[in-house]
Amino acid sequence: MKLQKSELPALLERIYSEVTPLYGVGKTADYIPPLSRVNPRQFGMAIRFVDGDEFTVGQASTPFSIQSISKLFALMLALDIVGDDLWKRVGREPSGMRFNSLLQLENENGIPRNPFINAGAIVVTDTIVNHSASPVKRLEQFMASLSGNVFNRYDPEVYVAEARTGYRNAAIANLLKALGNLEGEVDVVLDSYYKQCSMTMSCLDLARATESLANKGKSSFRTQFHGERMDKRVNALMLTCGLYDAAGNFAYQVGLPAKSGVGGGIVAVLPGYFSVAVWSPELDSYGNSVLGQKALELLTHYTSSSIF
């Protein structure tokens, strides 16, 4: 990485000044009412190095709805619980179709392509539900153990909106059940899934929570962690499947494993160096933050950092 840490504060300010003119290019997620009401003119960014040094700019400490970024933490927890047995129920390939496709799920006998599309994430949540007395609390505690912030919780208003508008997710869960790949009760699994997607965290929380993915599974906040080289496996899935239908273009433009959510957040890691989280609510047509993607592209450009 061609940059001294002492130069990072100035670089982050430069990135901030270069991305904020993009306000208005995208739009907030209008199909989840609480997200549509978020002030769109916000941007935050936080970087955490594997030695614990942190740098931030903008609204890096502002909590927001992490949405599909929660699928990353649910995956890590499910793998912590059942290990490679999870892959008997969900694949590890890009889908090539919409993240909430029913057609692909039925054509492939109820085995979702990967854990980041909705069908795969629901199977992951089902795994947690079937191994936990209180699955939502267990996930909250797991995420708190990664971020060091015990106040990360789901947002009740967002949860209610998710549940009221989640018709397609209900269809996916029922199809999974019909095809024999949902062990729990549909309503119970969906309730946990909606609460999971409604979790709130800040950029700083997310950068800390993904530190282990940049540091060979080692976390500053958690003494025991997931299995051998979990970071390698999860990072591979983020690179190929982490940004909906734009994963290939993001790998080309940015060159880091990453996971996004329609709340406007993106987490990314440069293994051996740092984890980074960005947030800005306005999305492109693929559901990814316009300013967030540009900020990460500028970061890797100015620091000559990439996994490639």
Swiss-Prot record:
Keywords: Hydrolase. The keyword Hydrolase applies. Gene3D superfamilies: DD-peptidase/beta-lactamase superfamily. It catalyses: L-glutamine + H2O = L-glutamate + NH4(+). SUPFAM superfamilies: beta-lactamase/transpeptidase-like. The gene is glsA. Substrate binds at S68, N118, E162, N169, Y193, Y244, V262. GO terms for biological process: glutamate biosynthetic process; glutamine catabolic process. It comes from Hahella chejuensis (strain KCTC 2396). Homotetramer. The keyword Manganese does not apply. This is Glutaminase. One of its GO terms (molecular function) is glutaminase activity. Pfam families: Glutaminase (PF04960). Its EC number is 3.5.1.2. Belongs to the glutaminase family.
